[in-house]
Amino acid sequence: MKRSSMDLVYKPISGTIGSVSGTIGSVSSVSGTIGSVSGTIGSVSGTIGSVSGTIGSVSGTIGSV
């Protein structure tokens, strides 16, 4: 029997999206000071490459009463 060109073997596409992890740091206020909000949007790595970023820091002072 002659095999046609349409007779193919399709392998399943499998992969892992890795892990998504991150910490939002800490938010603290002491004597009228809005501390710092810092965190890191961890990394998403897998067969689709990697995406990583950091949300810097936000800090300010309300002064004292």
Swiss-Prot record:
Protein task: Precursor peptide which undergoes post-translational modifications by tailoring enzymes, leading to the mature natural product.
TIGSVS motif repeats: 16-21, 23-28, 33-38, 40-45, 47-52, 54-59
UniProt entry keywords in alphabetical sequence: Repeat
Methylcyclopropylglycine, modified sites: 17, 24, 34, 41, 48, 55
UniProt KW Ligase keyword: no
Keyword Kinase: no
Name assigned to this protein: Precursor peptide TigB
Modification note: Is subject to maturation by TigE, that catalyzes the formation of methylcyclopropylglycine (mCPG) residues from isoleucine residues residing in the repeating TIGSVS motifs.
